[in-house]
Amino acid sequence: MFSIVYTTTGNKEEARRIASRLVEQKLAACVNMHPIDSIYEWEGRIEQDTEIALSIKTTSSKVETVTGCIKEMHSYDLPAIISWEIKGEKQYLEWIAGSTRP
């Protein structure tokens, strides 16, 4: 099984630091980074921020470890970390499996 883990960061440097560690440690095959505008409620106030969204491609068995790594490195008090299982083109999924194998 394969998954995408999604999170956001406050800036590109933090996004690159998290993405690099995940790929270097073979926890993710690929991390896409996207600039986004976010509107959300935090501590009773409506906030608007520019953030970087990360789409992290990994195996489902590594989601918990990926989540722990993100939480360890993240600057937010409560980072958004969500995941969902995916289907895809067979060869691409095989590449994800191979790229995350120690």
Language model: regions and residue ranges:
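Positively charged, small/polar-rich N-terminal and surface patches that mediate targeting and assembly
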Residues: 1-102
